[in-house]
Structures are given as C-alpha cells and as structure tokens.
Amino acid sequence: NRQESGNRTAPSAMNRQDVKIYICTKNASYLYDHKAHAMIPVNDGDVRPADAPICLILVTDTAEPWAAMDAGIVSQNISLFCSGTGLATYPRASMNKDALAKTLKLTSLQTPMLCHPVGYKK
C-alpha cells in the first residue's frame, strides 16, 4: 500500500477496493487495515489451510460483481512481491471456506476467495 496517499497498490474494478486480506500465522489471525497499515487481531489459534509460516486469505464481498477479478489482481501482486523478495507462494482456492468464514468472523456476504501460503524457497 501507499501510505503517502492512502491508496492501495493493486487496482480494482471501479476502484471498489473490496478485497480484505487476512493474515494467518501459527498463533493467531489478523485483518490487515490498509489505512492504518496495521494488523487487527481476529482470533487466536492456527487456522492456516497450509503449512507455510503465514497464509494470506483474500476475502471478497460476493455482492460485488467484480469480486473474483479484484481478488485475482491482488493475488498477482502478492505473487510478484514474493517472487521479487525471494519468498515462495502460490495462489490456491482449495480451502475449507465455511470453517475459515466462521473462524475469521466473516459476514454472510463475505467469502474466502483465494489463499496464498507464503514461505521461504527451498
């Protein structure tokens, strides 16, 4: 994100900026607040759907017509950043979405769209 302007790095359809990023670690889950550049605690415990040190869960509002496309744009930015900094990641859609939605305290209109396990290259 661009702290100087408050804008996000990834564009979105009609500038909706509806993709929420949750950071899941071994000990807790957080919601990333892009305006404050802060991680807001959501819960304790390990809910990572993969074994990587962290998993980034991209959550979208299913009422937004461009939600899947916006999640794809954010996903590409995550992949490019990780590649450029020597980290390993890959986007995946396979995860227990119902369990994650409950654990992350999502609304009925929000859904986990993509997961990015992030770790070190082997």
Can you say where each PLM-predicted feature lies in the sequence?
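Short coil/turn connectors at secondary-structure junctions
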Residues: 51-54, 109-111
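A glycine-rich helix N-cap at a beta->alpha junction
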Residues: 105-122
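Solvent-exposed coil/turn segments that connect beta secondary-structure elements
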Residues: 26-28, 35-37, 61-63, 95, ...
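N-terminal amphipathic, basic helical "cap/leader" segment at the start of enzyme domains
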Residues: 1-52
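Glycine-rich loops and low-complexity Gly/Arg-rich segments
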Residues: 46-49, 80-82, 114-117
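Generic structural "secondary-structure junction" signal
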Residues: 41-44, 71, 108
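Small-aliphatic-rich amphipathic alpha-helix that forms the alpha element of a beta-alpha
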Residues: 21, 56, 60-102
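Secondary-structure transition/capping residues
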Residues: 4-7, 89, 111
